[in-house]
């Protein structure tokens, strides 16, 4: 099963059609916040999150960073129409938009087959991850609130 998060209806529609034609079950989210709510309530298996990097409320970058801390085994594939803006950060595999059926399916298969996700973090990410775990740490009575984790992430100073 794949979770596809994008604020563009047309991208979700096309992505769903391409993925379903390849045999994938697809959940859709209109932005990162909705994706977090879906992830927080999902009880079944999820193989991959595909997320637009630039979305309102919670961006795909924030979604990927929170998942790299709290669900490190879950692969994330970023999609964007602004490829030049993300070339400096190579921790997340990126598929440029617009994509073809072939390029999407190839990226999905690579991500799932190779367990591609945010690569091992650099020191800054480790510091942020440690602080994020402290702020949003779960207990036996309270599971991780992924939405609160993004809010905490936004409050963590960089550097």
Predicted features by range, described:
Residues 30-34, 58-63:
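Acidic catalytic/metal-coordinating carboxylates
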Residues 13-21:
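Charged docking surfaces used in two-component/phosphorelay signaling
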Residues 99-112, 119-121:
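C-terminal output helix
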Residues 28-48:
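Acidic, metal-coordinating helix/loop segments flanking the phosphotransfer/catalytic sites
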Residues 114-159:
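CheY-like receiver
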Residues 55:
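Receiver (REC) domain active-site loop signature in two-component systems and cognate sites
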Residues 52:
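Active-site residues of response regulator receiver
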Residues 77-80:
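Hydrophobic/aromatic residues positioned on beta-strands within the core alpha/beta folds
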């Amino acid at each position: 099963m794949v979770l596809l998060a994008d604020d563009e209806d047309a991208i979700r529609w096309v992505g769903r059609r391409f993925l379903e034609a390849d045999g994938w079950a697809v959940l859709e989210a209109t932005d990162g916040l909705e994706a977090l709510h879906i992830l927080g309530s999902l009880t079944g298996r999820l193989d991959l999150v595909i997320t637009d990097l630039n979305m309102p409320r919670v961006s795909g970058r924030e979604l990927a960073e929170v998942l790299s801390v709290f669900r490190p085994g879950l692969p994330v594939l970023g999609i964007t129409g602004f490829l030049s803006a993300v070339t400096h950060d190579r921790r997340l595999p990126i598929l440029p938009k617009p994509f073809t059926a072939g390029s999407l399916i190839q990226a999905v298969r690579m991500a799932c087959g190779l367990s591609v996700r945010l690569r091992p973090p650099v020191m800054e990410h480790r510091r942020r991850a440690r602080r994020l775990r402290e702020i949003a740490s779960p207990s036996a009575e309270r599971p991780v609130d992924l939405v609160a984790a993004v809010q905490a992430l936004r409050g963590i100073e960089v550097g």
